Amino acid sequence: PKTDVNESEEVSVVENNKLSTYDDSEFWMTFEDGTRVHLNYNTTLKYPPHFGTTTRTVYLDGEAYFQVAKDSKRPFRVITANGVVKQYGTTFNVNTHVPGITKVVLVKGSVSVLPNQGGEYKIKPGELAVLQADTQDVYRRY
């Protein structure tokens, strides 16, 4: 079931659901909107019980592979310690295992990498974006 939750409410309830994997485990999960997520080893994902009407937001520490269900009215956002990855329906991997660095690899579709200090960097399939927390720079590699 869907609920009408605004952004500020989402932030407060996101702590209610937390899924963690450890050295010897990984995990696949599917959200109510059809988005699939694979959590790699030593990863924590925080998420709301239900996505809101304007956005779908999760919080990641570690590495996860996302197969995001298309929804042009509700972008999917992955928030990390260094910035945000935003998209509307695509497949990508986010890795935050190295402190101060977020790596995003796009498999198909398009995503934007948004450093905490502002700016937006779009990447294409096959590209790797590396966000450095100390400088807030985003580097693209092919």
Regions found by a protein language model. Give the residues of each.
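Short, small/hydrophobic-biased targeting/export segments
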Residues: V13-A133
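Single-pass transmembrane signal-anchor helices and their membrane-water interface zones
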Residues: P1-V5
